[in-house]
Amino acid sequence: MQAQQYQQQRRKFAAAFLAFIFILAAVDTAEAGKKEKPEKKVKKSDCGEWQWSVCVPTSGDCGLGTREGTRTGAECKQTMKTQRCKIPCNWKKQFGAECKYQFQAWGECDLNTALKTRTGSLKRALHNAECQKTVTISKPCGKLTKPKPQAESKKKKKEGKKQEKMLD
């Protein structure tokens, strides 16, 4: 009886050992198969940097729009693509829709030119846009207006009528 148990244990051990060897061989084959595959990826250094055009609004002169990008490279799969963009509507468009400036307060009115000016320094440039470091803008001086006498006289008339009603 002991001999039979011994034979069964040997068979179980041999089966487990063979299963272990089989698993090791399968894992080794899978790893070897991965190493043999040639690299299909194109190196990033073969493609040039993306160069983006200015943002072109879909409608009007601000809001949502698109820009086109191009890059060079013989092995590049994609050399052109379109990207969605947005031009803020509160930016000064005369200096470029992609350049944001921080402006100082308006200066005093120049009586010779009837203009007042202020300067702005570059705060931010979107998508590597080429922007001037400082810009100057001018606008006509506002007319110096005196308080309207009509407005004051209307107030006085109303107050006078109120006093008359109170006296009655």
Swiss-Prot record:
The alphabetical list of record keywords is: Disulfide bond, Growth factor, Heparin-binding, Mitogen, Secreted, Signal
* Biological processes per GO annotation: bone mineralization; cell surface receptor protein tyrosine phosphatase signaling pathway; decidualization; dendrite arborization; dendrite regeneration; estrous cycle; integrin-mediated signaling pathway; learning
Q: Name one GO molecular function term.
A: carbohydrate binding
User: Pfam families annotated for this entry?
Assistant: PTN_MK_C, PTN_MK_N
Q: Give the free-text PTM comment from the record.
A: Phosphorylated by NEK6.
Q: Which InterPro entries is this protein grouped with?
A: Midkine_heparin-bd_GF, PTN/MK_C_dom, PTN/MK_C_dom_sf, PTN/MK_diS_sf, PTN/MK_N_dom, PTN/MK_N_dom_sf, PTN_MK_heparin-bd_GF_CS
Q: Which PANTHER family match?
A: PLEIOTROPHIN, PLEIOTROPHIN FAMILY MEMBER
Write down what this protein is called: Pleiotrophin
Q: Which gene encodes it?
A: PTN
